[in-house]
């Protein structure tokens, strides 16, 4: 929806006026690193969730995550859920074993125990509801659960990650210039359509 896209860009532009210039070259991990390692900044309005930064002894400062701001009176929605997944190569000589492993590592028993204890960020909701895990990571999953539940899953087609990277660069340029929102939305729509042909 072009109208909502323009509103979102305008809102980002308004927020960006309050940012330090370093924000335009930092990725979400760098933001979490600065928040957890210095006392220079205390808040980031939107950031990817990294539960390790909420654990004791991971960094100097323990971060507290919360749900994203509700701008629509529909709850904390509009974020996207992504992350690193697991896949099985079609060239594998042990597909059955790989499939068995995939089910095991994604399963609740593994996710709430060895996966989490080894520094992984669980994607299984049973682990998200686990009180011990929440106690150990400053209630990361409890505090962000509404956002997680209302997020949309990042598209999985081959060209999407390239689109995400390139569109992020273009939006970043827009935030620091006088590019028209109307022109930018048209460009992003074209890029997204082209991402299906990668």
Where do the model's predicted regions map?
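Glycine-centered hinge/linker elements that transmit conformational signals in sensory
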Residues: 1-27, 68
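Short beta-strand->loop
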Residues: 1-4, 46-47, 89
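Glycine-rich, aromatic-lined ligand/substrate-binding cores of catalytic
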Residues: 13-17, 34-46, 87
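Extracytoplasmic/periplasmic substrate-recognition and gating elements
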Residues: 17, 55-121
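Beta->alpha turn/N-cap motifs
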Residues: 28, 44-52, 84
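Short helices/loops that flank or line small-molecule/ion binding pockets
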Residues: 28-44, 169, 173-177
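Long, aromatic- and glycine/proline-rich binding clefts that accommodate carbohydrate-like moieties
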Residues: 116-169, 173
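Short, charged, surface-exposed loops that flank catalytic or proteolytic processing sites
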Residues: 173-188
């Amino acid at each position: 929806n072009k109208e909502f896209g323009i509103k979102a860009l305008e809102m980002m532009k308004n927020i960006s006026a309050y940012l330090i210039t370093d924000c335009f070259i930092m990725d979400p991990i760098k933001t979490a690193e600065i928040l957890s390692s210095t006392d220079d900044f205390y808040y980031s309005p939107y950031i990817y969730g990294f539960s390790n930064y909420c654990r004791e002894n991971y960094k100097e400062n323990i971060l507290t995550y919360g749900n994203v701001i509700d701008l629509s009176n529909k709850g904390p929605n509009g974020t996207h859920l992504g992350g690193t997944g697991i896949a099985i190569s079609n060239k594998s000589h042990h597909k059955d074993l790989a499939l068995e492993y995939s089910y095991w590592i994604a399963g609740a028993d593994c996710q709430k125990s060895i996966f989490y204890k080894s520094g992984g960020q669980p994607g299984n909701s049973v682990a998200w509801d686990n009180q011990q895990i929440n106690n150990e990571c400053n209630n990361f999953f409890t505090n962000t659960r509404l956002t997680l539940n209302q997020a949309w899953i990042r598209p999985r087609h081959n060209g999407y990650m390239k689109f995400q990277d390139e569109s992020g660069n273009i939006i970043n340029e827009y935030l620091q210039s006088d590019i028209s929102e109307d022109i930018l939305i048209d460009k992003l729509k074209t890029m997204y359509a082209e991402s299906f042909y990668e």
